[in-house]
Amino acid sequence: MKLKEIALFNELASGEAGEVEITGITSDSRAVQRGFLFAALKGVKADGAVFAADAVKRGAVAIIAGKDTAIADAGVPVLHVDDPRHVLAIAAAQFYGKQPEVMVAVTGTSGKTSVASFTRQIWAYAGFPAANIGTTGVFSPTRSDYNSLTTPDPVELHRVLAELTSEGVTHAAMEASSHGLDQRRLDGVRLAAGAFTNLGRDHMDYHATIDEYLGAKMRLFNALLPKGAPAIIFADDQFSAQAIEAATLAGCDVKTVGRKGNFIALKRVEHERFRQHVEVRIGEEIFEIELPLAGDFQVANALVAAGLAMVTGVPAAAAMRALALLKGAPGRLDLVGATEDGAPAYVDYAHKPEALENVLTSVRPFTTGRVIVVFGCGGDRDKGKRPIMGEIASRLADVVIVTDDNPRSEVPAQIRSEIMAAATGATEIGDRREAIFTAVSMMQPGDTLVVAGKGHEEGQIVGNITLPFSDHAEVAAALAARLEEHPK
């Protein structure tokens, strides 16, 4: 592809510059190969302009940079633009050229992964070759690629979308994080619909205020969705009204789900141990669903996913039937096993205050004994949530064990102390493996254990090193060791 064939560069790349052949695109100078277009982006920690010379040395034939970015004597065309992140996303979309016919995106603090996964499953039930992209990876009829980035950078995203299209995928659901939206990673995606789940405290190390955080998420509606496109909004969150207003002002076709929903109205929920009986109204029809998932938050996620599926071609009756067959996303209230007495042990990704509150509230109805929770907070991230999560854990669980969870460059004991300050009666065990084994060893009949924070993750980040670690594997090992000591 020639540089001038990327529509945005028609005028900027005139003459000989426009004839330059582009063989790839990247914003990482280390990934540059001969013929690449390099995007010199300003980041929080570094300015890509510093690496422009290195990119050229590695083979870059053109550079995208901001209008206020000076790159002297580059030796290749430098295209100065108002919003280089937006331009990078559009260029990546044009370079790779293909994406599934039907694309939807979901934003919100919690539930994005589950909604994207559930939407894929409902589409698949209805006969559409479908995929989902997000925190747990890329899942389609032909692949299960695990990674840990909620919204991939635009080059990687469009490479994956092109591959999925070549594999025959026609429908894809993706997560839209506030970082991804703010950094324009989705700007080249042609969306058919969008969704909002909820808003709580998260990423306060990146966004200055909750209003700024909400504003980043609302870019999905006011910048990315075409006018008239459906916006599925969970109606029962404290920020639902703001999301509805933003989507309405953006010209979206707003459809709400939940107890206050006007599209899918939740009428009744009856909790059982590992499933829930749900009654909803859609138009004039009443549907009874046996949802094979625990927790009110999973009901909300399922309804948002059903809404997305319905506005993209799935009949209501088929969508409701599909809900009875849903499987939880990896690491989302994931039942690992049980003790010899039948006390269940779960792993959950909850690493934010609202998510921790949701999961602990969800297991309470079917817990006849104690709720036991093991959790920690990440280093180099929002410090303000640590005492908040400590208070939530001590209020909603009967036994709290505070441990380490990706301390990164911080002193682990300091992180734990900030949690412990508000976690009345909690036990502190820094070693996460020891904390899990201790929790499993103390389980009694009727108890429920939740190990929160990592979910699907397979590592513990200490300093700059990621050490192999799986909550799922450690809980399974602890249960196995217990069963050896106490056979049924």
Curated annotation (Swiss-Prot):
Carboxylation is probably crucial for Mg(2+) binding and, consequently, for the gamma-phosphate positioning of ATP. Belongs to the MurCDEF family. MurE subfamily. The gene is murE. GO terms for molecular function: ATP binding; magnesium ion binding; UDP-N-acetylmuramoylalanyl-D-glutamate-2,6-diaminopimelate ligase activity. Its cofactor is Mg(2+). The modification N6-carboxylysine is found at residue 217. Meso-2,6-diaminopimelate binds at residues 381, 405-408, 453, 457. GO terms for biological process: cell division; cell wall organization; peptidoglycan biosynthetic process; regulation of cell shape. Its EC number is 6.3.2.13. It is found in: Cytoplasm. Keywords: ATP-binding, Cell cycle, Cell division, Cell shape, Cell wall biogenesis/degradation, Cytoplasm, Ligase, Magnesium, Nucleotide-binding, Peptidoglycan synthesis. The keyword Calcium does not apply. Catalyzes the addition of meso-diaminopimelic acid to the nucleotide precursor UDP-N-acetylmuramoyl-L-alanyl-D-glutamate (UMAG) in the biosynthesis of bacterial cell-wall peptidoglycan. It catalyses: UDP-N-acetyl-alpha-D-muramoyl-L-alanyl-D-glutamate + meso-2,6-diaminopimelate + ATP = UDP-N-acetyl-alpha-D-muramoyl-L-alanyl-gamma-D-glutamyl-meso-2,6-diaminopimelate + ADP + phosphate + H(+). ATP binds at residues 108-114. One of its GO terms (cellular component) is cytoplasm. Pathway: Cell wall biogenesis; peptidoglycan biosynthesis. UDP-N-acetyl-alpha-D-muramoyl-L-alanyl-D-glutamate binds at residues 29, 150-151, 177, 183, 185. Its main location: cytoplasm. A motif (Meso-diaminopimelate recognition motif) lies at residues 405-408. The lineage of its organism: Bacteria, Pseudomonadati, Pseudomonadota, Alphaproteobacteria, Hyphomicrobiales. This is UDP-N-acetylmuramoyl-L-alanyl-D-glutamate--2,6-diaminopimelate ligase. It comes from Brucella suis biovar 1 (strain 1330). InterPro entries: Mur-like_cat_sf, Mur_ligase_C, Mur_ligase_C_dom_sf, Mur_ligase_cen, Mur_ligase_N, MurE/MurF_N, UDP-N-AcMur-Glu-dNH2Pim_ligase.
